């Protein structure tokens, strides 16, 4: 690639700042990396014009937003139906709990029985589904016509529906007041008018708090991204500092190693001398505990006598060695005379012993 295709450092820094301001993509790239790869920085900048912060393309993000809008709409519709269904079930449960303790009027009994009958038939018809879409036999062989026969009378249904609206409104009002007291316990002592006014504004308050939570989460996310970038930058700085410290330590160690070795040698020498003195002190302590002054004097006398005897024996041995040396001058003649003398001495001792034995016998 020609040298003119590269960007200058100033242009690279400008591109770097633009990419950092876009925060796209969420990766830990250092300034050096982006400056060394200016075309990659331009690619990120161009890419940021076609995608949002989550990485989706603008078209796909728009379709996703529309899809989420439809989902929320269907969810709202389903929640309304589910809330109404649960409120009706709670009305029936409260009714059956109530009749266990107190007597109810005929109108209440008729209202709840008609409501329960209508609810059960409606649920069964929903379970059966459209007849034209069924490919399998219906449950228990029932058809919608069979279920329509179980419907309450139209007059009873109209009367029940008119009262049901009031009952549902009253039940929902109780739930709203309960929710308000849970959110703001101080509202429990307020009148119904004040509670109704607070409930009317409760949705806006909750939406505002939800928005605050979302804003706080967004700020936290931004802070986390900033923290990750700073952590990456600080890690690089720490690595460089550690490398520098390691090099300085190695250089300083080479300079001071000889002095350190000399100090260690002196320390070991002094320590060995101290250990020898300590051993000698222990030895003297043991000797002083073992031998008294009288024992030491007796041992000194015995040693003097033994040394004198050894000296006399050494003198006798020296005299005998001199005599032997003088006899060795005679050579083989001296050896023959010594052997002859030995034989004669042995014969004399034998005869002396025999004479002693004879003398013992004759006595």
From Swiss-Prot:
This is HAUS augmin-like complex subunit 4. One of its GO terms (biological process) is regulation of microtubule nucleation. Coiled coil: none annotated. It is found in: Cytoplasm, Cytoskeleton, Microtubule organizing center, Centrosome; Cytoplasm, Cytoskeleton, Spindle. GO terms for cellular component: centrosome; cytosol; HAUS complex; mitotic spindle microtubule. Component of the HAUS augmin-like complex. The complex interacts with the gamma-tubulin ring complex and this interaction is required for spindle assembly. Interacts with EML3 (phosphorylated at 'Thr-881'). It comes from Homo sapiens. Its main location: cytoplasm. Belongs to the HAUS4 family. InterPro entries: HAUS4 (IPR029327), HAUS4_met (IPR026214). Keywords: Cell cycle, Cell division, Cytoplasm, Cytoskeleton, Microtubule, Mitosis. One of its GO terms (molecular function) is microtubule minus-end binding. It comes from the Eukaryota. Contributes to mitotic spindle assembly, maintenance of centrosome integrity and completion of cytokinesis as part of the HAUS augmin-like complex. The gene is HAUS4.
């Amino acid at each position: 690639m020609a040298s003119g295709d590269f960007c200058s450092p100033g242009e690279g820094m400008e591109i770097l700042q633009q990419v950092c301001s876009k925060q796209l993509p969420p990766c830990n790239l250092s300034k050096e990396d982006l400056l060394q790869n200016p075309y990659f920085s331009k690619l990120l900048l161009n890419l940021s014009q076609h995608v949002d912060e989550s990485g989706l393309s603008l078209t796909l993000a728009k379709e996703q937003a529309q899809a989420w809008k439809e989902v929320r709409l269907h969810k709202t519709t389903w929640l309304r139906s589910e809330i109404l269904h649960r409120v009706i079930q709670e009305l029936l449960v409260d009714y059956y709990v109530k009749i266990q303790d107190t007597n109810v009027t005929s109108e209440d009994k008729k209202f709840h029985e008609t409501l329960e009958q209508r609810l059960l038939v409606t649920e069964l018809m929903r379970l059966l589904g459209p007849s034209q879409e069924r490919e399998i036999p219906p449950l228990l062989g029932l058809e919608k016509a069979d279920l329509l026969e179980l419907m309450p009378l139209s007059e009873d249904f109209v009367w029940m529906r008119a009262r049901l609206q009031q009952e549902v409104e009253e039940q929902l009002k109780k739930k709203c007041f309960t929710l308000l007291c849970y959110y703001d316990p101080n509202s429990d002592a307020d009148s119904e008018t004040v509670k109704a006014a607070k409930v009317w504004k409760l949705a806006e308050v909750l939406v505002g708090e939800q928005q605050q939570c979302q804003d706080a989460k967004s700020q936290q996310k931004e802070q986390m991204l900033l923290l990750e970038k700073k952590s990456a930058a600080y890690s690089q700085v720490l690595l460089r500092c550690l490398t520098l410290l390691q090099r300085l330590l190695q250089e300083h160690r080479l300079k001071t190693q000889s002095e350190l070795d000399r100090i260690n040698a002196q320390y070991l020498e002094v320590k060995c001398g101290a250990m020898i003195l300590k051993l000698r002190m222990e030895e003297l302590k043991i000797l002083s505990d073992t031998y008294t002054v009288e024992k030491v004097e007796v041992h000194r006398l015995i040693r003097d006598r033994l040394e004198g005897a050894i000296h006399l024996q050494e003198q006798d041995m020296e005299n005998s060695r001199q005599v032997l040396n003088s006899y060795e001058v005679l050579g083989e003649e001296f050896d023959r005379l010594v052997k002859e003398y030995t034989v004669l001495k042995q014969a004399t001792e034998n005869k002396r012993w025999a004479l002693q034995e004879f003398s013992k016998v004759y006595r």
